Structure formats: structure tokens, C-alpha cells
Curated annotation (Swiss-Prot):
The keyword Acetylation is annotated on this UniProt entry: no
Origin species: Oryza sativa subsp. japonica (Rice)
A GO CC term attached to the entry: endoplasmic reticulum membrane
Gene Ontology MF: a single term: sphingosine N-acyltransferase activity
Transmembrane helix as UniProt keyword: yes
UniProt-listed Pfam families: TRAM_LAG1_CLN8
Domain TLC residues, every copy: 68-282
Domain of life: Eukaryota
Protein name: ASC1-like protein 2
Length: 303
């Protein structure tokens, strides 16, 4: 007997048992990073960072740190790119990809919060939750300890909690788009760091410019004026207030508070980015180390 095919379009209500996939994805991502670190990133870092005729002294602290930073950014770039492609491949054919009203209605007579979730959309959520679960342990035992260690740890823990809550409370359609618009800009941030460590200043500058522009367009324009507008206004007439007298309003207010908090964070980090960008351009003509070296790493807390 062969393995039955996976029905990616199969719909079901979110269940707590679905979270069993999170540790599996966390272990999977750990294994993938370990293999890439050992057989790809290490070799790539030595080849790109150090000249062929330059003797690489791994005993020096600076050399080891630079390679570790390169490998961390390379891994994050790979993850965010894969997460972005996965989210887009799953959502771009859905009616709610182009019409935010369809976050809350359909298919058929389904109306939020009584909406089932396709198996492939569940995959997007479990993949993201698995990454942030893995990141909690990687931050503690694997990655370089930075000055923002505490903030990063809180960020990863809260990310897992918020992804889980939004899944159970059936905000998965909105959440998948929020994940996609945030992961997109992070790809260019990590690419800029890799380029900086490798000495490709022009590519680093271009990557950071795209990162800043995509941040502004996706997080400061599309996110508040389309996503938050929908979660604040479009959903209201769709909710059956008699059937969901308590849980409907509770979910509405709790998650809109969280989503607007995310907007505040996006604005805060944008102001920091803008100031640093202007300062670096005026002083050096290009973005320097302190913007992309790892001391600048804006957080993303998904809904």
C-alpha cells in the first residue's frame, strides 16, 4: 500500500492537537540549520569574507565572530525567504489575498469566527510557530549573545504565543498576510548583513535601501490602511453578535489591540532606521556597520 496523497485543500476547524506539529517543525529547522552551517555556510563565509591569499586564523576572536554572524544572517535570510515563498504560494490564489473583506466571509456560508482553515494554511502557521520555538533555544544555546538578548528572547516567546492564539481564535487568514508582509522586508535586511560581512558594500547599500522602502510600503502603508482597516471595520457587520455574544467581541478587541501594538512597533523602528540611515549617508556616503551588523535587528511580533 502506498502513502495516500496529501489533500492540501482539505478544510477543518483549528484544534489544539494541531500544535503537535510545532515541535516537529522546530526540530526540522534545527536539523536544516545544523547541516547548512556545517556544510554550506561555513565554507561560504570563509570564501566570501577572507581573500584567497589571506590566511584565515580561526583562533582570532574577530575572525570567529565574523563567520558566526555571517552564518546567522545567512540562515535567517534562508528562513525568511522560504517563509515568504510558502505564504505567497498558499495565499495568492485565495479570494482574500486581493480582497480583505473575504478575510471574514466564505467560502460558501462560512462567516468569521465560524470558518474552517485549509490544511496548507495550517502548514504556514505551524512553520512560523516552529521557527520561533526553535529560535528560543537557538538564541540561548547557539547564537551570539548580543546586548538585546533579553528583548529578543521576549520577542520569540511572545511570537509563539500570539501565533498560537491567532490560530485558535481563527485569525489565520489575516495572520498569514501579516506574516507575509513582515517576512518580505526581513529577507533584504539579512541579505544586506551578509553583503556587508562579505565586503560587497554596493549590494549591502542596495539591499538596505530595498529593506527600508519595503518596510515603509508594507508595514506603514499597506498594513494599517488595508489590514487594520479590515480588522477594525470590515469584520464588524459580519459578526453574528447573538451567536458570539461574548467570544466575538473579546477576540475582536484583544487582537486589534495586538495588531495596533505591532503598528506602533513598526513606526518606532522606522524612526530609528530613518535617523540612522540619514546619519550614515551624510557622514560616510553609505550605510555603515552599525546599521546592519546585528546591533540593528527590528522585531516582528505576529498577530
Amino acid at each position: 500500500m502506498g502513502v495516500p496523497p496529501v489533500d492540501w485543500e482539505a478544510e477543518s476547524y483549528p484544534a489544539y492537537s494541531d500544535f503537535a506539529a510545532i515541535p516537529l517543525f522546530a526540530v526540522f529547522l534545527f536539523a536544516v540549520r545544523y547541516l547548512l552551517d556545517r556544510f554550506v555556510f561555513e565554507w561560504l563565509a570563509r570564501r566570501l569574507i577572507f581573500e584567497k591569499d589571506e590566511k584565515l586564523d580561526l583562533a582570532t576572536h574577530a575572525g570567529r565572530i565574523k563567520i558566526r554572524k555571517f552564518k546567522e544572517s545567512a540562515w535567517k535570510c534562508i528562513y525568511f525567504l522560504s517563509a515568504e515563498l510558502l505564504a505567497l504560494s498558499v495565499t495568492y490564489k485565495e479570494s482574500w489575498f486581493t480582497s480583505t473583506k473575504n478575510f471574514w466571509v466564505g467560502p460558501g456560508d462560512q462567516v468569521w469566527p465560524d470558518q474552517r482553515i485549509k490544511f496548507k494554511l495550517k502548514l504556514v502557521y505551524m512553520y512560523a510557530a516552529g521557527f520561533y520555538t526553535y529560535s528560543i533555544f537557538a538564541l540561548q544555546f547557539w547564537e551570539i549573545k548580543r546586548s538585546d538578548f533579553g528583548i529578543s528572547m521576549v520577542h520569540h516567546v511572545v511570537s509563539v504565543i500570539l501565533i498560537a492564539l491567532s490560530y485558535i481564535f481563527r485569525f489565520a487568514r489575516v495572520g498569514s498576510i501579516v506574516l507575509a508582509i513582515h517576512d518580505a522586508s526581513d529577507v533584504f535586511l539579512e541579505l544586506g548583513k551578509i553583503s556587508k560581512y562579505s565586503g560587497y558594500q554596493l549590494l549591502a547599500d542596495v539591499s538596505f535601501l530595498i529593506f527600508v522602502c519595503s518596510w515603509a510600503v508594507l508595514r506603514l502603508i499597506y498594513y494599517p490602511f488595508w489590514i487594520l482597516w479590515s480588522t477594525s471595520y470590515e469584520v464588524v457587520p459580519m459578526l453574528d453578535k447573538k451567536k458570539h455574544k461574548f467570544d466575538g467581541p473579546l477576540h475582536y478587541y484583544v487582537f486589534n489591540c495586538l495588531l495596533f501594538s505591532l503598528l506602533v512597533l513598526n513606526i518606532y523602528w522606522w524612526v530609528l532606521m530613518y535617523r540612522m540611515l540619514v546619519e550614515q549617508i551624510l557622514s560616510k556616503g553609505h550605510v555603515g556597520d552599525d546599521v546592519r551588523s546585528g546591533r540593528f535587528s527590528p522585531p516582528f511580533i505576529p498577530p
